[in-house]
Design a protein with these regions (language model features):
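Extracellular glycan-recognition regions
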Residues: 22-213
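Bacterial N-terminal signal peptides
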Residues: 7-16
């Protein structure tokens, strides 16, 4: 009987450790983004400031965490873009293989309050093949949506991205209802995480936390 009780305690202990490890919240050190040993920057410059600020220039930009492999879990981040059409595509890339192969959720703040374009406010993409243009042409309104609630397009907003492969849910400003729910189009189930900005776009990021499961 004592041996059985001891075995149960040991099992509970190790399962408890496992669960704690799986649900551990990680807050990457954003003050170290200029350190190439910890972060990899592609096609952007980092502008000094209180938040991570990526400049705008032609082509997509990516700033990814080196020593982290993300599978499933929850990504929380504060994001800010600008209210200028075609110059504000800001979001999070995940399951990154390299700077051209990744999945991403991104926002178009200039569409947030536009009656005609609000349906294009949050977007899922899976590069290199499933670009926003390809998805809009072939699957209209399936991989992009309005956001609820509607943030100020020039202010900070909070994004929560829940990945449970292949399902991805996106929540804005702590809403209980998702603004977007999609199934991933890539077969990759893991990879790096990073800040992403689109063509000619600059973006600001802060308060990044990641809970892996």
């Amino acid at each position: 009987m004592k041996k059985l009780i001891y075995s149960m305690i040991v099992i509970q202990f190790f399962f408890g450790i496992s669960l704690l490890a799986q649900d551990k919240e990680i807050s990457p050190d954003l003050s170290s983004v200029n350190n190439p040993d910890q972060w990899t920057l592609h096609n952007r410059r980092i502008i000094d400031g209180e938040a991570v600020h990526l400049n705008g220039q032609p082509g997509d930009g990516l700033l990814s965490i080196n020593e982290m492999v993300f599978k499933n879990g929850t990504i929380n981040v504060d994001i800010k873009g600008i209210d200028e059409r075609g110059r504000s595509f800001v979001g999070i890339a995940f399951h990154i293989l390299n700077d051209s192969t990744f999945d991403a959720i991104y926002f178009r703040p200039f569409n947030f309050k536009s009656p005609e374009r609000k349906g294009h406010s949050v977007q899922y993409i899976s590069h290199p093949n499933n670009t926003w243009y390809f998805l809009r042409e072939n699957f209209p309104e399936k991989y992009e949506n309005p956001v609820m609630p509607v943030p100020d397009p020039t202010d900070w907003f909070h994004a929560t991205i829940v990945v449970n492969y292949p399902k991805v849910e996106v929540f804005v400003d702590n809403s209980e209802e998702p603004s977007l729910v999609v199934e991933q189009l890539s077969s990759r189930k893991e990879g790096k995480i990073g800040f992403w900005v689109g063509n000619n776009s600059e973006g600001w990021f802060k308060n990044l936390t990641i809970v892996s499961k």
